[in-house]
């Protein structure tokens, strides 16, 4: 089961979140049938949103949009505070690797664009923030957002490793944030440790990558685990929700669906679930509008 572990240095100087998001990203790949680069880009976005959502309280919903002007198109993710996340990528078929190493490429094909977050507190006044894409690798773009928009200097590592068949092998990440109690000496020490950390891809390849991430972040520094919470890819779409959407259409449009298509098929963008509405269903909706 996927999880996020929240922790804090015993000194109170900084906190860290580490995530295992393997099942989340694997299910997203399965639902959207994404190729290698699209899988990694979508996966990193989902993990970034899992981190953001873990920072929220109540029934907030957090939307992350990675909007580039190149190969991937838009990547959209929505998460809640209960560990659920969903998402999709416009172009599922990007499959670009380095010839020599087989490394899956993302950043060079993201293009120019923005990292957009929308936090809906349920009050009718969502908070929206937009920062430019810095590298297109998503992790660095997320870190820049946290520093610029939330005024919280953060170190971020996100990645998705694929097997020889380009299926998700492991996915996860971390966030480290300096807290107000940190002294200049402590900040310098942690910055040095983060600079010396192995690459996120190397840590994820460890047998127990969650423990490997924590060990790399804290070293010999004592720390406390604050919580361990489950994570999952879960869509909240339903037939009732799409029926309500059909109810908003003019009667003429609904009648055209009956006359021309003998019904309607609606596909959820976030999870690919198909909902069928036959002629009788559409006629009932028309009658309800009368």
Curated annotation (Swiss-Prot):
PANTHER family: 33 KDA CHAPERONIN (PTHR30111:SF1)
UniProt xrefs under CDD domains: Hsp33
Post-translational modification: Under oxidizing conditions two disulfide bonds are formed involving the reactive cysteines. Under reducing conditions zinc is bound to the reactive cysteines and the protein is inactive.
Location(s), subcellular: Cytoplasm
Ribonucleoprotein in keyword set: no
Record GO biological process: protein refolding
Lineage summary: Bacteria, Bacillati, Bacillota, Bacilli, Lactobacillales
Protein keywords: Chaperone, Cytoplasm, Disulfide bond, Redox-active center, Zinc
Free-text function comment from the UniProt entry: Redox regulated molecular chaperone. Protects both thermally unfolding and oxidatively damaged proteins from irreversible aggregation. Plays an important role in the bacterial defense system toward oxidative stress.
One Pfam family hit: HSP33
Organism superkingdom: Bacteria
UniProt keyword Transcription regulation, yes or no: no
Protein name: 33 kDa chaperonin
Disulfide bond annotation, renumbered to this chain: 235-237, 268-271
InterPro entries, alphabetized: Heat_shock_Hsp33, Heat_shock_Hsp33_C, Heat_shock_Hsp33_N
GO cellular component assignments: cytoplasm
SUPFAM superfamilies: Hsp33 domain (SSF64397), HSP33 redox switch-like (SSF118352)
GO molecular function, one term: unfolded protein binding
Family: Belongs to the HSP33 family.
Main localization of the protein described in the UniProt heading: cytoplasm
């Amino acid at each position: 089961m996927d999880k996020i572990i929240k922790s804090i240095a015993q000194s109170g100087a900084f906190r860290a979140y580490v995530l295992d998001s393997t099942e989340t990203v694997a299910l997203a790949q399965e639902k959207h049938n994404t190729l290698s680069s699209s899988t990694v880009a979508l996966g990193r976005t989902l993990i970034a949103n899992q981190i953001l959502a873990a920072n929220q309280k109540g029934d907030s919903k957090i939307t992350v949009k990675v909007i580039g002007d190149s190969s991937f198109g838009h990547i959209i993710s929505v998460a809640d505070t209960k560990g659920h996340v969903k998402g999709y990528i416009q172009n599922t078929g990007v499959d670009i690797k380095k010839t020599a190493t087989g490394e899956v490429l993302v950043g060079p094909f993201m293009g120019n664009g923005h990292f957009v977050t929308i936090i809906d507190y349920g009050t009718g006044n969502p908070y929206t923030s937009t920062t430019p894409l810095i590298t297109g690798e998503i992790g660095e773009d997320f870190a820049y957002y946290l520093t610029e928009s939330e005024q919280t200097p953060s170190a971020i590592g996100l990645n998705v490793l694929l097997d020889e068949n380009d299926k998700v092998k492991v996915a996860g990440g971390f966030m480290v944030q300096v807290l107000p109690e940190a002294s200049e000496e402590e900040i310098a020490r942690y910055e040095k440790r983060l600079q010396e950390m192995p690459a996120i891809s190397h840590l994820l390849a460890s047998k127990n990558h969650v423990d490997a991430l924590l060990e790399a972040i804290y070293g010999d520094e004592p720390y406390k685990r604050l919580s361990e919470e489950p994570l999952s890819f879960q869509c909240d779409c339903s037939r009732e929700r799409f029926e309500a959407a059909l109810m908003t259409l003019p009667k003429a449009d609904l009648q055209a669906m009956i006359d021309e298509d003998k019904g309607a098929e609606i596909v959820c963008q976030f999870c690919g679930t198909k909902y069928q509405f036959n002629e009788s269903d559409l006629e009932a909706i028309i009658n309800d509008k009368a």
